[in-house]
């Protein structure tokens, strides 16, 4: 459903943001 898509997109966005933050802090 639509809510599942929204939740999935939010989860992906959050995960990629977390990865970016981790890269900034620890270096990739």
Curated annotation (Swiss-Prot):
Pfam family, one: Antimicrobial_2
Domain of life: Eukaryota
InterPro entries: Antimicrobial_frog_2
One Gene Ontology cellular component: extracellular region
Localization: Secreted
Key words of the record: Amphibian defense peptide, Antibiotic, Antimicrobial, Disulfide bond, Secreted
Primary site of residence: secreted
Covalent S-S links between cysteines: 23-28
Segments forming a coiled coil: none
Tissues expressing the protein: Expressed by the skin glands.
GO terms classed as biological process: defense response to bacterium
Role, per record: Has antibacterial activity.
Family the UniProt entry places it in: Belongs to the frog skin active peptide (FSAP) family. Ranatuerin subfamily.
Protein name per Swiss-Prot or TrEMBL: Ranatuerin-2AVb
